[in-house]
Amino acid sequence: MKKFAGLITASFVAATLTACNDKDAKQETAKATAAANDTVYLYTWTEYVPDGLLDEFTKETGIKVIVSSLESNETMYAKLKTQGESGGYDVIAPSNYFVSKMAREGMLKELDHSKLPVLKELDPDWLNKPYDKGNKYSLPQLLGAPGIAFNTNTYKGEQFTSWADLWKPEFANKVQLLDDAREVFNIALLKIGQDPNTQDPAIIKQAYEELLKLRPNVLSFNSDNPANSFISGEVEVGQLWNGSVRIAKKEKAPLNMVFPKEGPVLWVDTLAIPATAKNSEGAHKLINYMLGKKTAEKLTLAIGYPTSNIEAKKALPKEITEDPAIYPSADILKNSHWQDDVGDAIQFYEQYYQELKAAK
């Protein structure tokens, strides 16, 4: 009996310990889940989160936001591919032409529109675009439109009606281009009358040869702080984004920008949830907050890019909304192109772009 009793006691103790361990494990899991739900990891462009922008969100929801700086769509894509299921981001900010690519490859979660009441505040003209029909995977945040910027103390603007004007000999060693393969190739493709989203290697090569003719005019390539070169006076003519125009004008730089007759190639930066997101609930809350009227207004005031929020646009000063260099007119938008994913052809763009930068 003692031996049997001992076996019973041992079994009881083992069962008790197992139950305790299971309980501890469940408690730890619950704690980890609670901690995860208290934090949202945001991967976005550096300038899109000016100081204090997210303070109100944390105050309202109790959710802490950890921000990582997004350097390029290509880097973001590669990082998410490499991380796989262990991906550490809840909200990302892909440009429209990467939304279609990532959605196709199963890298994005479908949005729950019932958790995004901000949808009713967004401009219908920005929604349901070919890159994301029905906005299943993304919501638009800001619009980018590159044009030809110039120092108004030196130029009056009549010199700039076409992208081809940047090739004029009078601009030798004076032109700043955006440090982005697609942006640079866009202007050459439009100059020669081709689709800026071409995937034809022969046409891409033709655009490269056209850019080699432009190379003697190129002083610099700059996408990090392209407005600063104009503010300092180092550059007086070049390719610039509309948001950068606002930044330069805030600094009282003598600068204006025009959109050439071929039209700009537009892009939209969006907010989306990666398929590997751990806090989908918090992600929806953050997207709702970032696209909301108050936040959208603050962001456009800070960095100049047009917002998708109609109510925020109404609240913005006219010096922004009525400046055609910042908010392109309806006619310009009709004459514009959308930057799309070029698939595997991106390798040709990147290869020729590196050769272009190395050329003298």
Curated annotation (Swiss-Prot):
Compartments where found: Periplasm
Main location, first listed in the record: periplasm
Signal peptide range: 1-16
Keywords: Periplasm, Signal, Transport
Keyword check for Magnesium: no
Pfam families on file: SBP_bac_8 (PF13416)
GO annotation, biological process: polyamine transport
GO molecular function: polyamine binding
Gene Ontology CC entries for this record: periplasmic space
Similarity comment: Belongs to the bacterial solute-binding protein PotD/PotF family.
Role, per record: Required for the activity of the bacterial periplasmic transport system of putrescine and spermidine. Polyamine binding protein.
Protein name: Spermidine/putrescine-binding periplasmic protein 1
Organism of provenance: Haemophilus influenzae (strain ATCC 51907 / DSM 11121 / KW20 / Rd)
Lineage: Bacteria, Pseudomonadati, Pseudomonadota, Gammaproteobacteria, Pasteurellales
Gene: potD-B
